[in-house]
Amino acid sequence: MEDDQCYKDVGESIAVIGMSCRFPGTATSPQGLWEMIKNKNTAWSEIPPDRVNMDGFYHPDGQRQGSISFRGAHFLLQDLARFDAAFFSVTEEEAKAMDPQQRLLLETSYEAIENAGLRIEDLGGSDTSVFVGSFVKDYEQVSLRDAHYQPRYAATGTGNAILANRISYFYDLQGPSMTIDTGCSGSLVAIHQACETLRHGESSIAFAAGAGVILTPNTMMPMTALNFLSPDGRSFSFDARANGYGRGEGVGFVVLKRLTDALRDQDPIRAVIRGTGICQDGRTPGIVFPSTKAQVSNITSVYHKAGLSFDQTAYVECHGTGTRAGDFVELSAVAATLAANRPQDSPIIVGSVKPNIGHLEGAAGVAGLIKSVLVLEKGVIPPQANFMTGNPRVDFQEFRLKVPTDLCQWPLPGLRRVSINCFGFGGTNAHAILDEAEFHVKGQRPPSIGRLATVAETEEIMVEEDSATPLPQLFTFTSPDQQGVVRIMHQYADHIRDTLEFKTTEDLNNLSYTLNCRRSQFDWKGYVVANTQEELAETLDSTDVDKAVRSKTRPHPKIAFLFGGQGAQFPGMGSELFYRFEVFRSSLEAATEYLLEHLGSQFNLLTEILRIQDESVIHKPSISQPATTAIQMGIVDLMKACNVHPSSAVGHSSGEIAAAYACGMISREDAWTIAFYRGACAEQMSIRLSGPRCQGLMCAVSMSEDDMRGYLSRESVSDTIQVACINSPKSVTISGDASGIRLIAAELKERDVYHRILDVPVAYHSYHMKYVDSEYKACLQDLPMDFCPGIAPMFSSVTGSRMELGVQSSRYWADNLTSPVLFSDAMKIMLQESHPDLLLEMGPQSTLRTSIADILDDMFAGRRINLAPRYVSAMARGNNETYSVLSALGELWSYGCNVDMQGLVKK
């Protein structure tokens, strides 16, 4: 037998990774079921008049032909006619013909998939199998009653095979798929078959379910005639009042996976199935009479094949039909096996969910399994409802059995284990053994892994921080319709506000991971960024429908990367990203090391970037240039780690360095080299030369190129002041002597023309730069000269056209320093040729926002607004950098980009 403390072999064990249910009363979810059974509540009610007119069928004598001897049962509270047909791609005409069992199975299948953290898009085409236990076909009787008015799709709407096949069809599952009818053991048999397909390698994932609804008296009358059903409509499991079972309706659904695979994929393991087995009674005194011998044989066989002893099993979820004969037979089997070696003062605990929700027949086994999973998770055993005095045929003390009447603690030390037993009215028995999950996952995962955690092989993007520090997190939401996104957000707000589960950073991290990485993707999407429970709930609550956007119809939206030039730098830029994202941090550290070791830098780049404002010299050209480029490249690396790649790129002035790197046209070492010497040469020029003409400034002006050139000509300053950058049809940057720039700025102020003097002490793209042209080229003479096409086209702001040759040459980068910046032309050509869906600015600030808006207005004026690409900025000064980057990723994701969110959550 086994040694639980040294258990290693998990090859044959099966993990329960997801479950959902629609059971009677308030047990509409596993948590709802737990609340019901914990409090000994029942879902019994009188039979609703919209199901059966009991005045026409009730008679206390169950032997009376055509009568029913009870007035109550256990029903779902929901309207069975309500069904989200569109979500499941079902037409209105098909939906009318569909058995409610099919509808409920579809709904619970989706909920179980979500609970398992699986995504619909990953299931399509897989070998996932589906097994459904079923017993009744009430809807077929109802819908086919009138031969002259039968639904067109009645064959597929009521066919028993379609209960399983409909699920396989909707999700495009290509593993085994079948409906199983063994009477009331059907769904536990379905679970057994699901486990077998996993054990034999036929499937990688298996769905198992059971279903049943009560719609017609025609099913009840034959069962009444055979004394199956209680005249009280209730189940009194193990009780002296046992007089038949009380019917119930509902659906239970579980998702199963081999334990080794579930551990590998970091799935949320709810419990572990150690063994399952089925057998048949054979000949008994009557076909509906159960057999103690057969059940003993099955229980013993399942434990033997699993290599387990009976000693560690503390609880048995029995079939517990509530018939005196059936209860006696089953409890005798439990006594002869699981309880045989128990001390009398330590009996095995037995229970049944049937008094709470009724006998669900085809769904009874899966209901017992879901209850058992909850018992293992909670570590307590709930009291038995409808139990007062034990069945007089059962000597509970002699049998070493106990029926709990109050919530009780787990009676045995160590591993928690339960058994589930079922038997069908035709003699098919089923048994399953479940272990708690914790024992099997302990030591298999890193200590920080939550209920849902990222795949172990995923690249680490995040920097580890103190879990007590609130970290901004991205939370994504998706739905097939726009209103659905907002509705889900508001529901999450209520849940987060009302629960104690989201008090720490780790809790929010787990939620972020689940929403971002373990949820199916639909057309409509929305996102929020928050770092506390309160902020998250408040932001979700305040979200309106306009924040939900529809993804682009193109499978992979095209993203143009845009890079600003000098003047965007500021003290501490990138510091928040440095402390949050490992990819960004590594990129800056590598740049710093390269500048020090290979380029002879006299400063530590990282130190200069992280300096506080009072100590910062970030505006010195020798520092600002390599720092800005390093920040831009770090953002590129971060985006690429999240699977965000450019379809094209445009750089403004020195922004072309990072643009060429992003497109794969130059190496990162070459990019750092170009930026380092660009800054060094610009600074040396101002130091080496003297005189007022060497003091340079730049100024951005809201004026067209033609108007500005005319203005400079009229003022006779075109020799000392040049149009350095054509940013957009409405904006230019002028550059030249500082004194002239200040005079023009004063005049523009008087004329109420918007302008802004840039925070750069050098007149880039003016005649000043001719003094360092040769020196800069000499510094770059060792750059590779062979043209590399890269992974995406770059559109040059030096030539105003697509880059074909020369980006690796020193001549090109000297022109980039000295020539006018034709950003507007480059953008227009890029938009015409590349047709991007999104424009993503990468830099310390969103300096290009206004220019891009002007260009888009000029190009798309008079056209439909959705033809213009959407602008997104990775960073914006004044905003938390992590918020900005996460918001940018959320924006890209919302528009249909396949953003890899795996590394954005702390592991």
Give the label of every model feature segment.
Residues M1-R22, Y58-H59, R64-G66, L80, ...:
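Short, low-complexity connector segments at domain boundaries
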Residues A325-A333, Q845-G862:
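Short Gly/Thr/Asp-enriched flexible loops that form oxyanion-binding sites at enzyme active sites
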Residues M19-R22, N41-T42, P290-K305, S419-I559, ...:
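Flexible catalytic loop/linker elements that gate and position reactive groups at enzyme active sites
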Residues G275-T276, Q280-G286, E538-T539, D544-K547, ...:
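Acyltransferase
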Residues I17, S67, R71-D79, T405, ...:
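Flexible, low-complexity linker/boundary loops enriched in proline and small hydrophobic residues
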